[in-house]
């Protein structure tokens, strides 16, 4: 009776169908020109990384995609610096234009430091993929602003070298090779300078005999004179030597009395 009254009054519960859930598949991979640009960026960056990145790693988040674009700009700068270094290495250092030699050395050193800094920034980006690191973004922004200028400010390079831990090595090899090439061009001997070798007879002739002090008793004041030992050693026969040893007392080596 209660059910009939409830149905007449509109209080009856009409059974509804259970809700069904359908998986919505969204294609996360870009299509067309965007896909080609991402593949080009991956090709440029993966050549400088210890392990290559995949397209899934890049499109997983917007931050990773943004970092890939920045890494591509750094990779292009690195390639340009490497090409400049290869061209500058073909320069022959001569004395005709010393000012040009200094400019070439300066450009080679700056290009090498800029290339190392770009590579360090790319590696820093690679290590920060999947992590939220504001410091990395700041470093790369500063790097991109610096490399976008027509003239590179080396003070910014020094700051980034200290931040990324890149040590600038002195370019001493250019001066050594420069001096070596000039010496060869002049026909000079570039070997080590050694003193001439003296013969045994020459060495013996240069040996100075020792000097001894001799006291003179003939004068009122005792004076000491220095004579070489060669002048006090006359050549005696064996018989004369035996006579001197019997009649003359032992004479000290340090003093000889002259009569």
Curated annotation (Swiss-Prot):
> Where does the UniProt annotation locate this protein?
Virion; Virion tegument; Host cytoplasm; Host Golgi apparatus
Instruction: Check the record and name the InterPro entries matching this protein.
Output: Herpes_UL51
A Pfam family of the record is Herpes_UL51
Free-text description of this protein's post-translational modifications in UniProt: Phosphorylated.
Q: What's a GO cellular component annotated to this UniProt protein?
A: viral tegument
Q: Which UniProt keywords apply?
A: Host cytoplasm, Host Golgi apparatus, Lipoprotein, Palmitate, Phosphoprotein, Virion, Virion tegument
Lipidated sites in chain (S-palmitoyl cysteine): 9
Quaternary assembly: Oligomerizes. Interacts with ORF53; this interaction mediates ORF53 localization to the host trans-Golgi network (TGN) and subsequent incorporation to virions.
Q: Which family does it belong to?
A: Belongs to the herpesviridae UL51 family.
Q: What does this protein do?
A: Plays several roles during the time course of infection, including egress of virus particles from the perinuclear space and secondary envelopment of cytoplasmic capsids that bud into specific trans-Golgi network (TGN)-derived membranes. Localizes its binding partner ORF53 to the host trans-Golgi network (TGN).
Its protein name is Tegument protein UL51 homolog
Give the originating organism.
Answer: Varicella-zoster virus (strain Oka vaccine)
């Amino acid at each position: 009776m209660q059910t009939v009254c409830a149905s007449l009054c509109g209080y009856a519960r009409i059974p509804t169908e259970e809700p069904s859930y359908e998986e919505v598949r969204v294609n996360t991979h870009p299509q067309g020109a965007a896909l080609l640009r991402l593949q080009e960026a991956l090709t440029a960056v993966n050549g400088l990384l210890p392990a290559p990145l995949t397209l899934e790693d890049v499109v997983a988040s917007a931050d990773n995609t943004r970092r890939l674009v920045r890494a591509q700009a750094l990779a292009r700068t690195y390639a340009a610096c490497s090409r400049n270094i290869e061209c500058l290495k073909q320069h022959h250092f001569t004395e005709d234009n010393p000012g040009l030699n200094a400019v070439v050395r300066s450009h080679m050193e700056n290009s090498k430091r800029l290339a190392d800094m770009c590579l360090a920034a790319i590696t820093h980006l690679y290590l920060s993929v999947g992590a939220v690191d504001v410091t990395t973004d700041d470093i790369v922004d500063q790097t991109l602003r610096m490399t976008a200028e027509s003239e590179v400010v080396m003070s910014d390079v020094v700051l980034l070298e200290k931040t990324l831990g890149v040590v600038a090595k002195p370019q001493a090899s250019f001066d050594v090779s420069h001096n070596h090439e000039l010496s060869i061009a002049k026909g000079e001997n570039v070997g080590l300078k050694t003193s001439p070798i003296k013969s045994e007879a020459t060495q013996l002739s240069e040996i100075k005999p020792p000097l001894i002090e001799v006291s003179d008793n003939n004068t009122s004041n005792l004076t000491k004179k220095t004579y070489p030992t060669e002048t006090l050693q006359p050549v005696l026969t064996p018989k004369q030597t035996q006579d001197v040893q019997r009649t003359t007392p032992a004479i000290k080596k340090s003093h000889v009395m002259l009569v």
